[in-house]
Swiss-Prot record:
Lineage: Bacteria, Pseudomonadati, Pseudomonadota, Gammaproteobacteria, Enterobacterales
Reaction catalysis annotation: XTP + H2O = XDP + phosphate + H(+); ITP + H2O = IDP + phosphate + H(+)
Family annotation (Pfam families): NTPase_I-T
Organism: Cronobacter sakazakii (strain ATCC BAA-894)
Keywords recorded for this protein, A-Z: Hydrolase, Magnesium, Manganese, Metal-binding, Nucleotide metabolism, Nucleotide-binding
Protein name: Inosine/xanthosine triphosphatase
Length: 171
């Protein structure tokens, strides 16, 4: 059984990680250890590079906190131009996989508040009345009428980031 350290305590992210690992490595193939670590970037990262830096830093911090594991995984959500997206970074003892998620265009009314310095989650909670929406369906769930959720989009990115770990051609 793989010991997977998730650099998050967010249920939407943990669910995506657990589901992806189960699909790639088999049901009950891993034990998740969720830890809260700093990203080293603002609460609402802006741009692809700042967001990826946040995910990479979370992995570094998770490895320092829990050095005995098979995998360390971080998901960092950010804003790029007029959209929200995330970076997934996965590391093992000797390898790294990274993938960027699908992007969701955001309405101007939401973007204006984010550009004024607010994080997307609290802005969406205020607009929808859903407390802690970032730990649930997220903006993705709201704007796709529930067809996708934060977790489902993260799940795809985790699957992509896992590709180097189960395909020999990457080694």
């Amino acid at each position: 059984m793989y010991h997977v350290v998730c650099a998050t305590t967010n249920p939407a992210k943990i669910q995506a990680i657990l589901r992806a690992f189960s699909e790639i490595f088999g049901e009950a193939s891993c034990h998740i250890d969720a830890v809260s670590v700093d990203s080293g970037v603002p609460e609402q990262p802006l741009g692809s590079e700042e967001t990826r830096t946040g995910a990479r830093q979370r992995v570094i911090n998770a490895r320092a906190l829990r050095p005995q594991a098979d995998y360390w995984v971080a998901i960092e959500a950010g804003i790029d131009d007029d959209s929200t997206f995330s970076w997934v970074v996965i590391e093992s003892a000797d390898q790294r996989g990274e993938a960027r998620s699908a992007t969701l265009p955001l309405p101007a009314a939401i973007l204006n508040e984010v550009r004024a310095g607010k994080a997307l989650g609290p802005v969406m909670s205020a607009w929808t009345g859903i407390d802690e929406i970032g730990r649930k369906e997220g903006a993705i769930g709201i704007f796709t009428a529930g067809k996708l959720t934060r977790s489902s989009v993260y799940h795809q990115a985790v699957i992509l980031a896992l590709s180097p770990f189960h395909n020999a051609i990457y080694r």
